[in-house]
């Protein structure tokens, strides 16, 4: 279950209902998908083959189709980041630059953890700490950045309206 940390006052929201209500008020889509159907050989696997990626996409094809139909998304892929990722530190420096997109930024966490820092409607930033099973959609034109948690690894399904709209605007 995702948790929230509000930067300026270092307040945490950990209760499931309170997290959902907070994100709903910020117009951030949050869903919890059933991660238990992920087979053991794909759990915490950060060296995915093309076949592994296709298997993950197939496992979650109904959920991807549902959210895509509801929200107008048209494309998806998988990203895997870990200590084995070439230039991981350089990638994380880029990811941590505050930016926005002209489309939603949608991620479903398959393995590992990630943090989206999002600028709230009041101008304050808050972290959404994500774990396997969490889906988040940062609305278009909302300032944010992404980083990893202490384990420095994540596998995520990325879902797009268009890949062109996903280009960051710094």
From Swiss-Prot:
Binding note for cofactor: Binds 1 Fe(2+) cation per monomer. Binds 1 nickel ion per monomer.
Cofactor: Fe(2+); Ni(2+)
GO biological process, one term: L-methionine salvage from methylthioadenosine
CDD domains (alphabetical): cupin_ARD (cd02232)
Binding residues for Ni(2+): 99, 101, 105, 144
Cited Pfam families: ARD
EC annotation from Swiss-Prot or TrEMBL: 1.13.11.54, 1.13.11.53
Pathway: Amino-acid biosynthesis; L-methionine biosynthesis via salvage pathway; L-methionine from S-methyl-5-thio-alpha-D-ribose 1-phosphate: step 5/6
Description of how the protein assembles with itself and partners: Monomer.
HAMAP family cross-referenced by the UniProt entry: Salvage_MtnD (MF_01682)
Protein name (record): Acireductone dioxygenase
Lineage, opening ranks: Bacteria, Bacillati, Bacillota, Bacilli, Bacillales
């Amino acid at each position: 279950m995702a948790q929230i940390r509000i930067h300026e006052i270092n307040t945490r929201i950990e209760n499931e209902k309170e997290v959902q209500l907070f994100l709903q008020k910020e117009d951030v889509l949050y869903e919890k998908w059933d991660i238990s159907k992920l087979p053991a050989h794909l759990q915490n696997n950060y060296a995915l083959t093309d076949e592994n990626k296709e298997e993950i996409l197939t496992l979650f094809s109904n959920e991807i189709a549902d959210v895509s139909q509801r929200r107008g998304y048209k494309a998806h892929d998988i990203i895997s980041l870990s200590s084995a990722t070439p230039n991981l530190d350089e990638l994380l420096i880029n990811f941590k630059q505050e930016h926005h997109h002209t489309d939603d930024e949608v991620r479903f966490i398959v393995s590992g953890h990630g943090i989206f820092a999002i600028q709230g409607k009041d101008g304050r930033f808050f972290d959404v700490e994500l774990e396997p099973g969490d889906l988040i959609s940062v609305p278009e034109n909302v300032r944010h950045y992404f980083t990893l948690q202490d384990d420095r690894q994540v596998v995520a399904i990325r879902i797009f309206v268009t890949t062109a709209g996903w280009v960051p605007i710094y």
